[in-house]
Design a protein with these regions (language model features):
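Chalcogenol-based redox active-site neighborhoods
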Residues: 1-181
Length: 181
């Protein structure tokens, strides 16, 4: 039985880690694109599914990070938690990493993070569809997507250097604008 080879775009140098270039798999999304749906694994040892389409009808800030157990991802996810608490109920927050669900649950409990986190470890296609899967380590590259109520991308940022945090102000402004209109 012949296996079909997966075909997708490779983007050498799309991400860096302390200057070392990394290759992203998948196309970059663009503002106006329909956000790809995906089923991710929620927190816990037997994780419940989390779907991007579950957020239709709400504005979603989707944060992709390599691992919650790294200093930059830790700071970023805690910051998104602070921002989420100040936002209205029409804006949801989802952080996706490649961490196992029970590791996410442990980290979130220790960090007092209550917004939804999910893992793409069982579905690397999510990383390809969003253009954030790094070929060299199979982790997600840092990125932020603001998705409106209709599932369209209103703002995105692919953060090239993985030790750099995203532009929170730009993402928050886009989320507030999407929620208002």
């Amino acid at each position: 039985m012949a296996h079909e080879q997966a075909t997708y775009t490779t983007r050498p140098g799309a991400f860096t880690a302390r200057g070392h270039e990394l290759t992203a798999l998948g196309d970059e999304l663009r503002v106006g694109d329909l956000a790809p749906d995906a089923e991710l694994a929620g927190r816990g040892f037997v994780p419940a599914p989390v779907r991007i389409s579950d957020y239709r009808g709400k504005v979603l800030i989707l944060s992709c990070v390599p691992s919650l157990d790294t200093p930059t991802c830790d700071r970023e996810t805690r910051r998104w938690e602070e921002e989420r608490r100040a936002l209205g109920g029409d804006i949801e927050m989802l952080t996706v990493s490649m961490d196992l669900g029970f590791a996410q649950a442990r980290w979130c409990g220790a960090a007092d993070v209550t917004h939804t986190t999910a893992s793409a470890y069982m579905n690397q296609q999510f990383g390809i569809d969003y253009g954030v899967l790094m070929e060299e380590n199979r982790l997600l590259g840092r990125a932020v997507f603001v998705i409106d109520r209709d599932g369209r991308i209103r703002h995105l940022e692919y953060v090239r250097e993985q030790s750099t945090e995203p532009d929170y102000a730009a993402a928050l402004a886009a989320a507030r604008e999407a929620a208002a209109g």
